[in-house]
From Swiss-Prot:
PANTHER family: ALDEHYDE DEHYDROGENASE-RELATED (PTHR11699). NCBIfam families: arg_catab_astD, PRK09457.1. It catalyses: N-succinyl-L-glutamate 5-semialdehyde + NAD(+) + H2O = N-succinyl-L-glutamate + NADH + 2 H(+). One of its GO terms (molecular function) is aldehyde dehydrogenase [NAD(P)+] activity. One of its GO terms (biological process) is arginine catabolic process to succinate. The gene is astD. This is N-succinylglutamate 5-semialdehyde dehydrogenase. Its EC number is 1.2.1.71.
Length: 492
């Protein structure tokens, strides 16, 4: 029984689904998808639970959410292993994900009060108040690259605000989704407040098509995000938060310490086997000897990166991709770039047949026309050369996406120019593109999102503002508007 609906574990009535470790092939999880009827049951359960949950004091909701944080802490080792085994990422990285989940609780509580708390302004004849109210029933679609942390970034603020939730994990990480749901169960959430439905495209379509849904919070690919946007078009009453991918540029300007800049580039492009939405996909290098030296050093260090299994010792920097199919898609993308005229500096290689262990790839595309503006979700970095910094900024902005952008430079004036001209939601200076703070908003523009950033701003899309003018008593104004006469009626 792998679905959690209205406080009970039930068996899915849809297709059978299995999940294996993408490196070893070990069977990890199996269960059945939720069918459309069960998705409807989950929605009805969430709707029935909403009034009571929303009427609880914030403190009462906070207690349950903080109890979940405690359970994450006490089950950190077990959850780390589940996430690592299912995604293929190394143990060390899965541990940082669980830590981020724990830290998200306190951050979300603070964000609720700062972004969506209550305010009161005294007026001569009363007061003006601002409060925030939950939307109702929200669907959360989780991704596979951070199957615990990223859904958590929607679910926690949604519950704190008083919403009830239907959570659909990625079909590639059902085990992690179930493991997190079991901790929420132990935290003592009332029945129906949080429901879990497993499944792929059919389950997702049934969930997003529900008429009685008040909103949908999504993290994933631009293609799926656009499909959801079209499906919910013409329904302005539903909140839709889309956190999508990017074709992110990293500009290398002047480099005093080449190894430090190479380290930053590797952290930007190849961490999580290139499976972060903020990963650098395009490296913009100065033409000339300095750019040549940097690229040579980047290739030399990158070719030493050997992917390994989640529990290998010593721990590898990167593990496998989410699936063998995903690894083959990256190789195919590299081959297509070569066919267009790209010059391979480092060829991506599948280490073993039947696994997702893929080494990083680097290919120079300077002077190649018609390169697709797409996100290749894996360890593949494309390189372009530029002559002037203005040209570098134009190249950085030459994308339909707008998630992250970075600059390596000793000159603050260039960073300030980039801040003014870059079209991206995250713009970093001498920091990896993959570095983000939960105390700041996280999201992009263009094809990277719909102006509903998450992290610190997640509270914004989990509640709507209610403004009030208030007075303890009602009296006739001493000064009336022209044309109003409240004198005693004169006998005719």
């Amino acid at each position: 029984m792998t679905l959690w609906i209205n406080g009970d574990w039930v068996t899915g009535q849809g297709a059978l689904r299995v999940k294996c470790n993408p490196v070893s092939g070990e069977l990890l999880w199996q269960g059945n998808d939720a069918d459309a009827a069960q998705v409807g049951q989950a929605c009805r359960a969430a709707r029935a639970a909403f009034p009571r949950w929303a009427r609880l004091s914030f403190g009462d909701r906070q207690v349950r959410v903080e109890r979940f944080a405690g359970l994450l802490e006490s089950n950190k080792v077990e959850l780390t292993a589940i996430i690592a085994r299912e995604t293929g990422k190394p143990r060390w990285e899965a541990a940082t994900e669980v830590t981020a989940m724990i830290n998200k609780i306190a951050i979300s509580i603070k964000a609720y009060h700062v972004r969506t708390g209550e305010q009161r302004s005294e007026m001569p004849d009363g007061a003006a108040s601002l409060r925030h109210r939950p939307h109702g029933v929200l669907a959360v679609f989780g991704p596979y690259n951070f199957p615990g942390h990223l859904p958590n970034g929607h679910i926690v603020p949604a519950l704190l605000a008083g919403n009830t939730v239907i959570f659909k994990p990625s079909e590639l990480t059902p085990w992690s989704g179930e493991a997190v749901m079991r901790l929420w169960q132990q935290a003592g959430l009332p029945s129906g407040v949080l429901n879990l439905v497993q499944g792929g495209r059919e389950t997702g379509q049934a969930l997003s098509a529900l008429e009685d849904l008040d909103g949908l919070l999504f993290t994933g690919s631009a293609n799926t995000g656009y499909q959801l946007h079209r499906q919910l078009s013409g329904q302005p009453e539903k909140i839709l938060a889309l956190e999508m991918g990017g074709n992110n540029p990293l500009i290398i300007d002047d480099v005093a310490d080449i190894d430090a800049a190479v380290h930053l580039t590797i952290q930007s492009a190849f961490v999580t086997a290139g499976q972060r939405c903020t990963c650098a996909r395009r490296l913009l290098l100065k033409s000339g000897a300095q750019g040549d030296a940097f690229l040579a050093r980047l290739v030399a260090v990158s070719q030493r990166l050997t992917p390994g299994n989640w529990d290998d010792e010593p721990q590898p920097f990167i593990g496998g991709l989410i699936s063998e199919q995903a690894a083959h898609q990256v190789v195919t993308a590299w081959q297509e770039l070569e066919a267009m005229g790209g010059r391979t500096q480092l060829a991506p290689r599948l280490l073993r047949a039947g696994t997702s262990l893929l080494t990083p790839g680097i290919v120079e595309m300077t002077g190649v026309a018609g390169v697709p503006d797409e996100e290749v979700f894996g360890p593949l970095l494309r390189v372009w050369r530029y002559d002037t910094f203005d040209e570098a900024i134009r190249m950085a902005n030459n994308t339909r996406f707008g998630l992250s952008c970075g600059l390596v430079s000793s000159r603050r004036d260039k960073f300030e120019q980039l801040l003014l001209e870059a079209r991206a939601g995250i713009v970093n200076w001498n920091k990896p593109l993959t570095g983000a703070a939960s105390t700041a908003p996280f999201g992009g523009v263009g094809a990277s999102g719909n102006h509903r950033p998450s992290a610190w701003y997640a509270a914004d899309y989990c509640a709507w503002p209610m403004a009030s003018l208030e007075s303890d008593s009602l009296t006739l104004p001493t000064t009336l508007n022209p044309g109003l006469d409240f004198s005693e009626e004169v006998e005719r």
